[in-house]
């Protein structure tokens, strides 16, 4: 009843702009696992290619800011307090910032990961315009969407473009980085690979909350094969919190490779991955960043999670290894179905199809390089 009353009052007080005539769009992004942030990026590109006249503002925080900082497919970022912990502060801040920027959004959208009542209320109370997208409170939205579990998270996010009668084809995520990020990445890689060998990145740690890890002794065999069998330099990436576990694996592998865990921002990580020849990676946030910069990779996926939702299916430079689908996670599960031999075979096949190449690394880096900085002073 309250929601219907609010919408009725809103209908009398707020101007109504049809989707075809929208010029100012505000998107709210506050559910911030790295993979969720990366999987929203195809929407921005799709809408800009279809409707270049629409100005896109994103209100977000944390990883949302990092992922979109250098994107050419949005027009501005607004950093706000977290509405999930302090809705009032977020509403007041967003109102004030929109007022200072002289922005009156024609609509407010939320992506497939941001289905939270407080985020919907931030759109209602903090901004002008009708609301559309994914929500747990469809009565608060004029154009709600239902999540389609038969398609990927990316495909669900692309359905936002359909509100504006845009029909994007399959799109890949993108993460852009600055020239400064690229220089930082080059310096790290010169330190890790002074001889300029082919470079394989190892992502050995998961996000911490899910059963997506692999056995240390199996990683060790793959690492040694990359170094001794393929003649590659090995670099380990991750967060500062991952560093001790990574060092344990590195020592178990005879101190093969160099760890740069905790030494990169998201965009510096993107540059490092773009400048590498291949990745062997768990299904974790770093994998999604690697996909977004088009790095060839072998992905070790969990059998208990629906592959269509998160994994880069039908991407030519990705080899996915996982067990038969299961509904439950066995105790102490560590991707037990994935053998050392299968990972080594997949890595060998990947590097035959996509040979280590200075030119390929340079092309990948160039495609993700951006001169835009939405967080720079005066931006």
What do these predicted ranges mean?
Residues 1-379:
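Catalytic machinery of carbohydrate-active enzymes
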């Amino acid at each position: 009843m309250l929601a219907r009353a609010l919408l009725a009052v809103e209908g009398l007080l707020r101007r109504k702009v049809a989707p075809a005539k929208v010029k100012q769009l505000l998107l709210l992004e506050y559910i911030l696992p790295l993979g969720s942030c990366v999987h929203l990026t195809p929407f921005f590109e799709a809408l800009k290619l279809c409707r270049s006249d629409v100005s896109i503002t994103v209100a977000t925080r944390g990883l949302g800011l990092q992922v979109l900082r250098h994107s050419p497919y949005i027009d501005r970022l607004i950093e706000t307090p977290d509405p999930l912990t302090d809705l009032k502060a977020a509403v007041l801040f967003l109102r004030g910032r929109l007022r200072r920027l002289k922005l009156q959004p024609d609509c407010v959208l939320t992506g497939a990961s941001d289905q939270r009542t407080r985020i919907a209320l931030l759109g209602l109370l903090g901004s002008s315009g009708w609301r559309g997208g994914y929500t747990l409170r469809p009565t608060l939205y004029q154009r709600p969407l239902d999540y389609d579990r038969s398609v990927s998270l990316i495909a669900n996010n692309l359905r936002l473009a359909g509100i504006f009668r845009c029909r994007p084809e399959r799109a890949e995520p993108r993460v852009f980085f600055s020239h400064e990020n690229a220089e930082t990445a080059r310096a790290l890689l010169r330190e890790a690979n002074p001889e300029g060998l082919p470079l394989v990145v190892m992502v050995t740690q998961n996000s911490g909350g899910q059963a997506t890890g692999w056995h240390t002794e199996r990683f060790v065999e793959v690492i040694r094969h990359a170094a001794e069998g393929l003649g590659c330099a090995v670099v380990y990436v991750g967060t500062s919190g991952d560093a001790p576990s990574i060092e344990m694996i590195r020592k178990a592998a005879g101190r093969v490779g160099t760890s740069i865990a905790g030494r990169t921002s998201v965009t510096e990580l993107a540059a490092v991955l773009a400048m590498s020849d291949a990745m062997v990676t768990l299904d974790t946030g770093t994998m999604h960043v690697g996909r977004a910069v088009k790095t060839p990779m072998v992905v070790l996926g969990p059998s208990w999670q629906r592959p269509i939702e998160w994994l880069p299916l039908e991407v030519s430079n990705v080899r996915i290894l996982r067990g038969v689908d299961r509904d439950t996670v066995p105790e102490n599960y560590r991707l037990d179905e994935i053998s050392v031999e299968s990972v080594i075979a997949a890595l060998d096949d990947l590097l035959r199809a996509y040979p280590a190449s200075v030119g390929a690394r340079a092309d990948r880096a160039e495609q993700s390089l951006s001169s835009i900085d939405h967080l720079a002073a005066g931006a």
